[in-house]
């Protein structure tokens, strides 16, 4: 049974953390995490409309591997990136700015592939509200 009053979707617009699967050759043991919004978030919906306009303007389809298609993809997923942890450049912490996010996603396709898969998975953003004695189903 699904009780609609027990569904917590606040993470859709507040974000949820992806722990990035770092290739073994690059993994130093410190986790890399990216906080992302869902495809159901207000920001994604707005950015997706712009993404579709860009693709239509250039007569491209979703997943197009042309330069314009890849840039549109990077901008779309940069929009839903809120923060990150464990990302360094030259040994120093690298701030999570839109410019840096775009640079990371454009140069490291293994990262954007994980971001893309994460934001479309509802389970990453939907949880059950804690049950109180009044809301617990009877045994």
Set out the residue ranges of the language-model regions.
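Short acidic, Pro/Gly- and aromatic-enriched capping/linker segments at domain boundaries
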Residues: 11-23
């Amino acid at each position: 049974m699904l009780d609609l009053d027990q569904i917590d979707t606040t993470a859709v617009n507040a974000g949820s953390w992806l722990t990035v699967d770092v290739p073994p050759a690059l993994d130093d043991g410190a986790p890399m995490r990216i906080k992302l919004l869902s495809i159901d978030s207000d920001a994604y919906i707005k950015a997706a409309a712009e993404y579709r306009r860009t693709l239509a303007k250039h007569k491209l389809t979703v997943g197009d591997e042309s330069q314009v298609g890849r840039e549109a993809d990077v901008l779309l997923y940069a929009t839903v990136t809120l923060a990150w942890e464990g990302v360094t450049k030259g040994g120093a912490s690298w701030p999570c700015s839109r410019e840096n996010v775009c640079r990371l996603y454009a140069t490291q396709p293994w990262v954007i592939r994980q971001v893309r898969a994460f934001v479309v998975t509802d389970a990453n953003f939907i949880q059950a509200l804690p049950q109180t004695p009044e809301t617990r189903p009877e045994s």
